[in-house]
Design a protein with these regions (language model features):
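Gly/Ala-rich phosphate-binding loop of Rossmann-like dinucleotide-binding domains
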Residues: 22, 26, 163
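Glycine-rich FAD pyrophosphate-binding loop
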Residues: 26-47
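Short phosphate-binding/catalytic loops that engage adenosine nucleotides
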Residues: 30, 117, 169
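Short, flexible, mixed-charge acidic loops at enzyme active sites
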Residues: 44-51, 135
Length: 187
């Protein structure tokens, strides 16, 4: 028959978001269980993550996504040190190959500034080539976002899960959630 789980909080999914939620909730006096249909954490969508820590210049101005991009970018390096997973602030270049594309770079620059992204600038010529020497000669300009970074999605998700488990979160793997039913005691 169906298994019943009697915790204060049940998190469905052991990807990056589920493990981050588990880790955060593990700081509180709660009985937390993370349920994952796979055999381990980070076996679904998170394993195919691009690994980019977005600076926040491309999210719609003032949006929740922009806020989370900027705040996440600012906090990720400290989190990587705390939990010991790979992080590299290598910056990002949004390339422009023709004059007609320059207004788009200006738009991204403005959007990023509205969103609170620090250090954005449009670079050209020698400054652009100094940032990326192997760049195509056809590139005429770029938006440079020095706060963009990359992480190891596996390393981060595993580190979050390990910390959550150390703090008392229970993990149930190979467990599929088929139904959630409301009861007098909750769900």
């Amino acid at each position: 028959g169906p298994q019943r789980i009697g915790q204060d909080v049940v998190i469905i999914g052991g990807g990056a978001v589920g493990c981050a939620v588990a880790r955060e909730l593990s700081r509180w006096q709660l009985d937390v269980c993370l349920v994952e249909q796979g055999e381990d954490v980070c076996v679904g969508t998170s394993k195919a993550n691009s690994a980019i820590v977005h600076a926040g210049f491309d999210a719609p101005a003032g949006s929740l996504k922009a806020r989370f991009n900027v705040e996440g970018s600012r906090r990720m390096e400290a989190l990587s040190r705390e939990l010991d997973f790979p992080y590299r602030r290598n910056g990002a270049l949004v390339l422009c190959f023709e004059e007609a594309g320059l207004p788009h770079l200006e738009e991204l620059l403005h959007r990023g500034q509205v969103n609170g992204v620090e250090g954005l600038e449009i670079v050209r010529g020698e400054q652009l080539r100094a940032l990326e020497p192997a760049l195509s000669e056809k590139a005429i300009a770029a938006l440079y976002a020095p706060s963009s970074a990359i992480i190891c999605p596996f390393g981060m998700t595993i580190a979050l899960a390990e910390n959550a488990a150390h703090n008392g979160v229970t993990f149930r793997f190979d467990t599929r959630v088929e139904r959630i039913r409301r009861t007098q005691a909750g769900y």
